[in-house]
Curated annotation (Swiss-Prot):
Gene3D superfamilies (UniProt xref): 1.10.3730.20
Listed name of the protein: UPF0060 membrane protein BLi00854/BL03049
Entries under SUPFAM superfamilies matching the protein: Multidrug resistance efflux transporter EmrE
Keyword set, alphabetical order: Cell membrane, Membrane, Transmembrane, Transmembrane helix
C-alpha cells in the first residue's frame, strides 16, 4: 500500500510540476527551457503509473485523479500562494474517500 501511495504522489508531483512549468512558459513568458523541462516532466509522469501493482489501468488512473486533486490544492496553496477555502478542502477530502473505496474495497 505504501508503494502505491508513493507512486501516486510521485506521479502527481510530476504532472503538476510539468504542467506548471509549461504554464509559466506560455502564460508568464518564461524562457523556452521552462516549457521543455515541463514537457519532459510530463513524459515522466506518463510512465510512473505503469509501475502500480493494480491490474486495471482505468482503476489506477481514476484513483490517481483523486490524489491529483489533493496535490493540486496543496500546490496552489504552497507554490501559487492561493489559499484554499472550505469547499476546496471538502471536495478534496470527498475525492480521497472515493479513491480509497476504489482501490481498497474488498472484491470477490
Amino acid at each position: 500500500m505504501m508503494i502505491a501511495i508513493g507512486l501516486f504522489l510521485l506521479a502527481g508531483l510530476a504532472e503538476i510540476a510539468g504542467g506548471y512549468l509549461v504554464w509559466l512558459w506560455l502564460r508568464e513568458s518564461k524562457p523556452l527551457w521552462y516549457g521543455l523541462a515541463g514537457g519532459l516532466t510530463l513524459i515522466i509522469y506518463g510512465v510512473i503509473p505503469a509501475f502500480q501493482a493494480f491490474p486495471s489501468f482505468g482503476r489506477v488512473y481514476a484513483a490517481y485523479g483523486g490524489v491529483f486533486i489533493i496535490l493540486a490544492v496543496l500546490w496552489g496553496w504552497l507554490v501559487d500562494k492561493k489559499t484554499p477555502d472550505l469547499y476546496d478542502w471538502a471536495g478534496a477530502v470527498i475525492c480521497l474517500a472515493g479513491v480509497s473505496v476504489m482501490l481498497w474495497a474488498p472484491r470477490g
